[in-house]
Structure formats: C-alpha cells, structure tokens
Design a protein with these regions (language model features):
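Polytopic transmembrane helical bundles with strong interfacial aromatic enrichment
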Residues: 1-159
C-alpha cells in the first residue's frame, strides 16, 4: 500500500508540474500578451512568476523525494536512476531561474520605465532580451526533460 501511495503522489507531482508549465507556456502567457498591452502583460506575468516557480519547486521536491523512495522500495534500476537524475536536473533548472535569473530580470526591468519608449539598441532592452532568452531556454529545457520523465514513467509503469 505504501508503494501505491508513493506512486500516486509521484504521478500527481509530475502531472501538476509539467501540466502547469505547459498551460502557462502555451496557453496563458500567449493569451495574456495577445489581449493586454506589453506593459500590462509584463506586469501580469511578473505577478504569476513567483507562484509558477514555487509550484515547480514544490512539485520538483515531491517528485524527487517520491522517486527516491520508490527506488529504495522497489530496487534501483537504470531507468529509475535516469528518471531521478533528470528530475534533479529539472529542479536545478527551476532553482537557477528563481535564484539567478529572476532577480537579474527584475533588476533590469526596474530600470525600464516603458518598453515602448526604449530604442531597439538600448542596453537595458538588450540585457532584458538576453535574460528573457536565457529564462525561456531554461524553461523549455525543464519542460522537455519533464516530457522525458513522463515517458520513462509510462514505460516503467505496471498496470
């Protein structure tokens, strides 16, 4: 019964983590930027980001913990080790975004009064674009790794 509960918690954490990322990345953010002005959309997304990243941290810690617990209970194998390592890398990606990237993005954004008034070659705009690109890349990598984790999980599940 303990194994069933661990599997349930593991599956729920992965579903909420990857599902939340997919929803925000492919549905919410594009719609927000389509409907609102760039300034307003940026403010909405900036308000969502702390919650978005905390969801990733909480779900990542739970997924990592339950994956380790399942490995201990069911004996480690190559796929379970790979899955657990990938989850750890995903969690590191989220933590990197929270601890390193987001403070830098916020610091640059605080210096920008309006994106509309900034020239395309303005150093602040270029720095914001560079940081945004790095943040996008980390987010995409975490999402893609999450899909790999989901595949490994589906491949190793016993019904």
């Amino acid at each position: 019964m303990v194994t069933v509960v661990l599997r349930f918690i593991y599956l729920l954490s992965i579903a909420l983590w990857i599902g939340g990322m997919a929803f925000f990345s492919f549905l919410a953010a594009p719609s927000i930027f389509k409907v609102l002005t760039r300034e307003m959309a940026g403010n909405v997304v900036a308000d969502i980001f702390p919650k978005y990243y905390w969801q990733g941290i909480v779900c990542g810690v739970i997924a990592l913990g339950t994956s380790c617990a399942l490995g201990i209970r069911k004996r480690w194998n190559v796929l379970l080790i790979a899955r657990t390592i990938i989850i750890a890398v995903m969690l590191i990606g989220v933590l990197y975004s929270v601890v390193v990237l987001q403070p830098k993005v916020q610091a640059v954004k605080a210096q920008i009064t309006s994106f509309e008034s900034l020239a395309p070659t303005d150093p602040l705009r270029l720095e914001f674009g560079r940081l945004h690109g790095r943040s996008f890349t980390v987010n995409a990598a975490v999402l893609l790794l999450g899909i790999v984790v989901w595949f490994i999980t589906a491949f190793t599940m016993k019904i």
